[in-house]
Amino acid sequence: MGTLTNIHGLPQSIVDAVTNDPYTGGGDISCTKLIDSPRVRVLGGKHKDQITVDVSERVWALLGQAVHTILERAGLRQEGVITEERLYADVDGWLVSGQVDTLHLASEKLSDFKVTTVWKKNGSDSWTRQLNVLRWLAHKNGGHTINTLEVVAIFRDFRKSEALRDPSYPQAAIQ
């Protein structure tokens, strides 16, 4: 991540939570890095020691981690569901990895949970690319057939009053 600052003097517990991110990506390249711009990936790797990020800028990532942890716990109670499992496949000597949020074996559906803004209510191309790589990884790991890809968006800035006023606005905080 580079250098982490705390210019707003946030409590040490928040700093510790941000720095205690267990995500490593695994393999040579993760699904999200694979679908990212090569230029962004190369420059980020080349200059990672020069990149400075403030703890306050990581709050939404922290919230996303919390949501994924809660959903993983819930998934443990469900039969025929794989949750938060990291998958790997070799591609020409590169170990590609990706983590599925929820794979429903019986319905052949792969769900990905995104904590996001209402401004992304229609999703993004990167979400579609990520789900397709995860679909491929699931097939490579156990031969799972996936016929449905689903993004479950959790809108951190949802406003019910806006939903009542505007039919094109998301009608629920989770869709």
Predicted regions and their residues:
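Short, surface-exposed linear patches
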Residues: 55-57, 132-134, 171-174
